[in-house]
Amino acid sequence: MIELSAEQANILLHIKNGKNVVVDSCAGTGKTTLILSVAQALSPKKLLQMTYNSMLRYEVKDRVKKSNIENMQVHTFHSLAVRYYLPTSFTDTGIRYILLKDLQPIVAIPKFDVFVLDEAQDMTFIYFQFMAKVARDAGSPIQLLILGDYMQGLYEFKGADIRFLTLADIIWSEFAGLTSPEFQKCTMKMSYRITNPMCSFVNQVMLGKDRMDACKPGEPVTYIRNTRQNMERVVAAEILKLFEEGYVPSDIFVLGPSVKGVNSNIRQLENILSERGIPCHVPMLENDKIDERVIDRKVVFSTFHCVKGRERKVVFVLGFDNSYFRFNARTLPRDLCPNTLYVACTRSTERLYVLENDSHRGDRPLEFLTMSHIEMKQQDFIRFRGQHQNLFVEPEERDKGSPIIKHFLTPTELIKFIPECIMEEISLTLDRIFITDGGEPDDLEIPSIMETSNGFFEEVSDLNGIAIPCIYYDYLQGGSQNSNVLLRLIQENIEEMRSNEHHYLKEIVKTLPENLESASDYLFLANISVAVQEKLYFKLKQIDRSEYNWLTESVLAECKARMDAVIGKECSPSSSYHIEDTIIHSGDEKAHCRIDEFLREHFDPTTQFRFTARVDLVTDSTVWELKCTSKISMDHLLQVAIYAWLWQMREGELVNEVKKFRIFNIRTNEVLSLNATLEDLNTIMLALLKGKFQKQDVKTDEEFIAECKEAI
C-alpha cells in the first residue's frame, strides 16, 4: 500500500465511506498517487479514470501496471468514445455525433463503481454530457471522485470551464445514477514538486494568498530584469552555467506565451543554443502535442499551455512582464494572476527563473505582483538580478490621428485558439460543405519521426509535406537542375533578413547543391526552407546531411502514382498552373477593399484585418491544398474554406469562372471538395473572426448550473 499524506488519507476515508468527493488539488500535490491508492483500497470495485490527454493516460497506465492494479481502466474522452461507441470518434466532432444521435454502445460498458474525473477544470460541456451518458448507458450506479486545480484552467478558449470543478457538487447532485447524493469537498495543498522558495514566490508575490504549501528546500527564485536584446544572452549564459553544474538539456524548459511570436525571445535564444551544439526542440505548431521521443535529451521551448501536466528540474519563464497582457491576454484583468503564469511557475522541481523585459519606456512589471522590485530584493526566497525601478511611464496612447487598428493574419493564425463553442457551430457547416471525392482512405506508411545517428528523434512530417510535392513538380517539368519552388521560397526569406543576422543560415544557402538528384536532396532543401522561414536552427543542426534517407523509392513511387491520378491532368505541359501561389498579401490594400466593406458592419470601424495567404497549387480549374498527414483535420478544412473566401473577396465580380477548392492528402489518398456558397463562407469567417477578436459572453453561475442539470 502506498504511504499517504494526511490530506490524501482524509480524502481516501471519505471515499471508503461512500461519499462523492470533489478535490481542489494544487500543482504537484500527488493526485495520481491518491487515485492509485483509492483503486487499491476499494478493490475489487472497478474504477474508470478519465485523463486530460493521451500523454497523461499512458503515464497513469504505466503506473497502474507497475503497481499491479487490475481494477482500473484509464481513458481519455476520445479513447473511451472509440472503445465503446464509435471507432472513428478520435475528435470532439465524433463525441458530438455520439451525443447528437444518442448512439448506443457497440460494446457493453463494464460495471464501473467509481468514475474518477481528473483535471476537471479543463472539462467542456460536451465532455460533461458524454460522461453522464456513459454512466447512464453502463446501467449501474456510480460514485464520483472529481479532481482538479481551478488555477490550472487554461482552455477557456476551447470551451473548458473551471466550474465543472468548483461547482461539481451542485451540477452532479441531481444525477439519478449516483450511489449516494452526498458530496464532500476536500483540498490538497502540499506540493511535492516545487521548492519552498518557489512556493513563497507563488503565494506571496503572484497570488497574495496561501494557495500552496511545500516541503523541500531549494535555491531562491531568480528574478531577472534586463533588456530584450540582452535577455537571450543572459539566459543562454545561465543555461551554460547550469550545464557546468551537472544539469543536462533534458532538465530544462524554456516557456513563453508564444514560441514563434514577433515579441518572443525564443527564436534568438534557440539560435544561440543550437549554434553551440546544444540539442533543442521548438514545436512547429504552437498547439502541437509534445512527443516524448522528440523532446528527450533536449532543451524544450514551449508555450505555457503545452507543458501542463509536465515538470522539469529547471524552468525559465519568459515574458514575465506586462507585455503578456498587451500581446497575449488582452481581455484578462491585469490585477489578477493569469492561470497560464501560475502553471508556468509551478513546472519546476529545483530551479525557477522569471524574466522581465526592460527595453522601452512603457515596459513595466506585471501589475498583479504584490511586491515592488525593492521589496523583492529584501526577500530571502528571491534572487533579484538587474536594475530595480519603482516609477513607470504609462504606455502612450495611440495616435489619435491614426485610429485604425490592423490585425495581420494568416489562415493558420486565424484558426488558432478559437473557442470550442465557435468550432462546434462551424463544424456543422464544414460537414455539409465538404464532399468526399474517390474511394476509401488508404494510408501509406510515411515516417513522421526519424532517429538520428546520435540517438535523437526528430519530427519530419513538415519536411515530407514540402519535399514530396516538390519532387513531383520537378518530375512534371521533365526534371530540373534545381527545385525552383524551394529555391525561390528560400531566397525570398533570405533577402528579408538583415545583413547582420542569421549568418549560419546564409552560409548554408550559399552551399546548396546545384543538382537535386535524390529524395535526400529535396528533404535537406525542405529543412532549409523551414529554417529560413521560421528562423530556427535546431532541426538543421540535429539532422546530419547524410541522414535524409527516410523516404524510400517505393514510397515515392506510390506518392507519384497518387498525385498523377489526382492532379496530374491539371498539371500537364499544355496547362497553366502556379506552385506556392500567394492569393492575397497584407500589404495589398486594393485586394482588401471588399473585405473591409463586408466586415465594417460586424466590427468596430477602427478595426481592420489584413490577410496573407499562400496556397500550394493553383491550376486552371482548381485551387489545391496538399497534405501529407495521418488524417485530414478540422483545421485543414478551415484553411481551405478561408482560402476560398479570400479568393472570392479579392476577385469579387471580376471572376470569369469559379475555381474549385480541394484538399488532397497524399498519405491517405483522400480528396475532399468544397461545395459552399459565399454565404456559407461568410458565416464561417465571421464566426472565426468574432471568436478570436470579440470577448465571448460568459454564462452566470445560475445559467451554467441550469444548463448542466438539464443535460443530465
Predicted regions and their residues:
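Metal-dependent nuclease catalytic cores that hydrolyze phosphodiester bonds in DNA/RNA
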Residues: 384-614
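Domain-level recognition of nuclease-like catalytic cores that cleave nucleotide substrates
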Residues: 369-379, 660-712
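Nucleic-acid nuclease catalytic cores
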Residues: 356-360, 602-687
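Mid-core helix/loop region of P-loop NTP-binding domains shared across ATPases and GTPases
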Residues: 94-113
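Catalytic phosphate/metal-binding cores of nucleic-acid and nucleotide-processing enzymes, i.e., regions
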Residues: 17-18, 67, 107, 117, ...
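Inter-Walker segment of RecA-like/P-loop motor cores
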Residues: 51-53, 58-59, 65-99
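Conserved helicase motor core of SF1/SF2 NTP-dependent helicases
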Residues: 4-9, 14-59, 78-80, 114, ...
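Conserved RecA-like helicase motor-core motifs
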Residues: 70-75, 274-288
